[in-house]
Amino acid sequence: VPETWDDLIAMLPTIQGANMSVGIPYPDIAAPNLSSYYAMLYQLGGALYNDSATHTTINSEAGVQAFERYTSLYNDYGLPTIFDFVSRFRSGEMPLGIFDYTTFNTLTVSAPEIRGLWDIAILPGTSRTAEDGSTYVDHSGHSQGACMMIATDSETTKQNAWQFMKWWTSTDAQVRFGREIEAVLGSSARYATANIAAIEQLSWSEAQLKVIREQMTWAVGFREVAGGYYTTRHMTNAVRKVTNDKTDPRETLLDYARTINEEINKKRLDFGLPIDEETP
């Protein structure tokens, strides 16, 4: 199992020499998935936006390095951009892949013939140097989720909704729901709860829980900002332009970063928020 992205790249000649490949999420049309780029960005010490959320920082040196590394997986190392990971993993064509941990559910049910021959592992990381001079591997990964919101002027409704939210997100409710749905539908319905205490009480093995616990400590999310919808849209455009048209990664990313920042400025003005006088 590769500890770092460099380890993964070093494995590719052996894997590809056996007519196999590795599955890395690509921003396709149906579901633009940039999680691997975001992971590389965080691992290099970068961020998607600046601290005041007034502009994107993908045009930083960390952002450019991460983008060059990510697109090189397809342009330089020949990883596929279109594939069905579950089918290829099951057949052995793709023995390694990086996907959200709920893919475990699908494989458990759809590939019973390889049960016990595979497992989950922590995300490949990037070697970094700490302030004291020691080296460590940064396994930061992109995390996202849903939220519960209350939109009403009624005080009674607010209180009732708040009580419901507290009950639904409680450990007891999450464990009960997770266990009952898995009892009815099987391991394909293993519940991806956001309650950390509830995860410990679901049907994960101790080895799997160890991986999940460790990866959770490296989870990073990015804030929602005014005009933020342009970020994913044009990051996807940038990746496709580099992989399809073979344009220069640095120049392509810098061009789209300017487009993203222009939209962020427009939306901040619409909402009466302060903007950067000189957006980088």
Predicted regions and their residues:
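Short helices/loops that flank or line small-molecule/ion binding pockets
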Residues: 9-15, 83-97, 237, 241-245
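Bilobed periplasmic-binding protein-like "clamshell/Venus-flytrap" ligand-binding domains
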Residues: 16-29, 170-180, 261-275
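Extracytoplasmic/periplasmic solute-binding protein
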Residues: 6-55, 62, 94-96
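Long, aromatic- and glycine/proline-rich binding clefts that accommodate carbohydrate-like moieties
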Residues: 121-125, 132-134, 179-241, 272-280
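Short amphipathic alpha-helical coupling segments at ligand-binding clamshell hinges
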Residues: 62-69, 156-168, 176, 252
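Periplasmic-binding protein-like
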Residues: 12, 165-190
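Glycine-centered hinge/linker elements that transmit conformational signals in sensory
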Residues: 5-14, 51-82, 123-126
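Extracytoplasmic/periplasmic substrate-binding proteins
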Residues: 35-39, 43-44, 68-163
